[in-house]
Amino acid sequence: MYEFFSPTKIIFGEGCASETVPRIREMGATKVLIVTGKSSTASSQGFKDLCKGLDAAGIQWVHFAEVGADPETSTVDKGAEVYRANDCNAIIGFGGGSPIDCAKGIAASIGEGRPIRDFVGTGLAFTKPVPPLVAIPTTAGTGTEVTNAAVFTIVDERGHRSKKGTSSQFYFPRLAIVDPLLHMSMPPSLTAATGMDALTHAIEAFVSRFHTPVSDMYCLEAVRRIGRSLRAACGISAVSDASADTSMNGASGAGRGVKAGSSGSGGRALLEARSDMALAATLAGVGLSQAGLGMVHGFAHPVGAMAGLAHGLANAILLPFVMEALIPDAGERLSTIGEALTGEQGISPQEAVRAIARLGRDIGIPENLEAAEVPQRYFEDILADALSYRRRKASPRAFTDDELKSLLERMYSGKVEI
């Protein structure tokens, strides 16, 4: 027996962002809190069009633009205060995974009338309805626009940072607006990292112990689209093109060590690749909500929290190592993944892992954590966090603590051959 629950209405297609205002008006919204990141989102044409549309419809709005990468629980609480102080009655999350996760947390906090920290890492469940929430992703990676999950950073009294995932049916946005045109300005390095994030979601959910025929369908279609379009979305027409360094070095570690081609304008071909990636991320999000995730995320969360490596990039680096370790336990399903990713038949589990690693190398993903400049001093803390990862039970292999330590050692300085 299995269940399938995915209540988010999805509107997908070029230009569909124009549907946002009429749809949120149908929800009875009169004053909207728009949650975005601190970066260039607010200066984007898509954001300006959204605000103009709300103004024209007579819907008031308040902009909360204090969301950093992997939002801290204190940021969520601050957003909830802004919502209450301005008597808002709906929320729009506009941007990448962090602003949308923050919007989810704000909605849940408003519904419960309590700080989000009361629910993160405590086991306490949400029980009360939330305000109308619309998610508008501008990156193709997390799929959070359709998931029941959100990830927040907790900073304790010692300054120790840890990322904790939470899940609830109340996190599902009421509406997801997935417009590939909003993704066209993503630089190649961000496209690469977020694209591999989506691939990680699809693969981990597909090999999960809790996979179902329905989740499999979503995950495999996501893998197919990523396999045929991620290189092109990064501006790479051939493997040899992946030579120009377009790294974006910043505090978030979003592009640390990432190389990819120039995105250029690309015309129709680039838009089609972006559309494939946008849909793939959404499909993978549906899949992971049904089947869960595994030890790639078990390691990626502490790597991101402690070393400042962007979540998508951390997943991209760690994915082939974990899948290599799963060959004895999930070989048949990895072969199926390999066939979907490459479009070829008769792929062995080993060839599938090499195909995953090759895709990462082609778009400039570093081959290990050392190459991504993750300091060795974080090793023990990363391991301790991974050992306590609550989703270990979804892994098709019941890793021992010693196996996870050996795996992390390999992630630091090893290499998955391609």
Task: Give short role names for the model-derived ranges.
Residues 1-90, 369-370, 398:
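ATP/NTP phosphate-donor binding region
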Residues 17-20, 43-46, 73-75, 98-103, ...:
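Short glycine/serine/threonine-rich phosphate/pyrophosphate-binding segments
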Residues 74-181:
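Glycine/threonine-rich beta-strand-loop-alpha-helix active-site module
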Residues 149-291, 402:
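Carboxylate- and glycine-rich phosphate/diphosphate-binding segment that chelates Mg2+/Mn2+
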Residues 199-203, 277-285, 299, 319, ...:
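Short alpha-helical scaffolding segments that buttress acidic/His motifs in well-ordered protein cores
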Residues 334, 341-418:
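C-terminal charged capping/lid subdomain of soluble metabolic enzymes
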